[in-house]
Amino acid sequence: MDFASLGVPKHLREALAVRGIAAPTEIQAAFIPAAQAGENLIGEAPTGTGKTFAYLLPVMERIDPAVRAAQTLVLAPTHELAMQIATVARELAQAAGLPIGVQALIGGANIKRQIEALKKKPAIIVGSAPRVQELHRLGKLKLTGIKLLVLDEFDRLLGKQHLDEVRTVIRLLPADRQVLLLSATAGTAAVRMAQELFAPRLIRVEGASDTHENYYHIVPFRDKIKAVQKLTRRLPIRRGLVFVGRSFDAAHALEKLRFEGIKAVALLGQERRDQRRAALDAIRAGRAQLLISTDLAARGLDIEDVDYVIHLDLPEDVRTYRHRAGRTARAGKAGAVISLVDAKELDKLRALAARMEIELSRLPRA
């Protein structure tokens, strides 16, 4: 099956091809035709199976660029997720040559800038329910033209923390709007509430989802190695992998961390086999807390019970992120991925997260 057989227009298929997406996933193949037909739907599928595109493709089809008004509203339970969705929607529209705007409306951001952005009449609004309510109350956001409502991670949006806010937003929308609800883990209570509100049809794809958390920590580029040292003091890292890329040299990072008193070893890519074995033995036996490696040197690596993966350099693409992250949280065990980013790298990380459909959280302060 391909996207053409699903009725996805050529300009959107070409936009997907630019991103290296050639064939639909199982959830996309089941969800897209039903969404195109105007059904109210629940889509439940594991993380990383393409749920964002499962609803964004029908959204893009429904948008009329000639209409200067908000036509689709996407609600998300966290600011980070809203920003990620807005990023991937904006990229998809641009790649497809669609002259439409996408605007994120979240609390904590400058509301005056959001009001200015709304004057450009974006077609797609992605945001948090409280900020959407606030801007509507101020008369800055008109919702009368909304044809499609999306609740991403609807199990959280229809939970106790967000339900009242979401219900308030729903009452502001036209009665004939279509509703699409997505989640990786839709529990019975959330599905029951969704059925009560929207009477949707459930489309479920089985499979295992990632069990690791994905964090980011903003730190100036020059202080990244120092940040790794601080994380080893602050977090219960028993066995961590630190990945370097173009900006950092593994040997240099090793020297700096050892100078700070961290028990670290490294795979340098050019060491002898016995040196590589010694480094791996040290991390496996618990004599070292951190293993520093490049992506190339880590190929084929098998280390059990890695509890943290740290990106000193961001991965170049989705495949590399998943390859690195897959070193932790194996066999259902807990784990976390921490990306150390300076302000300039944050947008790149958010774009990666959006493509993978993972939620980023800022690493809590100590």
What are these regions (language model features)?
Residues 2-366:
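Conserved helicase RecA-like core
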